[in-house]
Amino acid sequence: MQTRLTLLVLVAIGALTINARPAAAQQTLNFSLGYFTVRGEDARVEGDVLNANRGIFVFDIDDFNGATVGGEWLVPLGEYFEAGAGVSFSRRTVPSVFADFVDVDGSEIEQDFRLRLLPIAFTVRVLPLRQTSPVQPYFGGGLALIAWRYSESGDFVDFQRQNAIFPGRFVASGTEPGPVLLGGIRFAGDSVSGGFEVRYLSGDAGLDRPFSILEANPRIDLGGWTYAGTFGWRFGR
């Protein structure tokens, strides 16, 4: 389903730009819509709270994968380079239950885990075929400031009070720097552009002790891959 949707997006982008004239070097206001996948269980930072929680709760790491949207301002630096500044947003709420405990009435002990990411990225791209080509493959990288928020809310078990069940809500947030790598292809006309991009983001942040009874210094891995279709409005000379 995801592959079919990606093909449809690329066909639509090609239809919009195939008859356009090759573009001179221009600024671009770029918009993206795609799918963000968090780093897998074996690739996550040591002490990651999601990996630790899987020993107690029932959920999968890839339950945190989901849609992402973004916007970016791109400025040419000569014919072969381009600088960008942009922001993207993703949020995912994952329902869970305790794996080995139930309430006194036999019902599940339920909670929600929520991860929100808002990376602000500053990047530089290399365009081997130049800005004036109607087909523009590119690659590059840069630095992102990742504004994040992670929360756990619902019912929990107090293992120090004879497994008493209590309602709780734990929230942490902050901003962490991290590297970003990207690559893609763009079909460029005089006034519009479109394409497809793959982006990798890396970063992690520390959490307080209440977020994990299994880790003395729990962390949250903020990294992952983004696969997105892009559409841009080109202006200026």
State where each predicted segment sits.
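Bacterial N-terminal signal peptides that target proteins for export
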Residues: M1-V9, I18-N19
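C-terminal segment of classical bacterial N-terminal signal peptides
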Residues: G14-P22
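Short glycine/proline- and aromatic-enriched beta-strand/turn motifs that initiate or cap beta-hairpins
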Residues: A23-V75, G232-R237
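Gram-negative (and chloroplast) outer-membrane scaffold detector with strong preference
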Residues: Q26-T28, Y35-T37, E72-V157, G224-R237
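Flexible, solvent-exposed loop segments that connect beta-strands
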Residues: E41-D60, R91-L115, A147-T175, A205-D221
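Predominantly the C-terminal beta-signal and adjacent terminal strand-loop region
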Residues: R44, R92, L181, R186-R237
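Transmembrane beta-barrel architecture of outer-membrane proteins
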Residues: F64-T68, L117-A121, E176-V180, S193, ...
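A charged, solvent-exposed segment within the mature domains of Sec-exported extracytoplasmic proteins
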Residues: P128, S133-S193
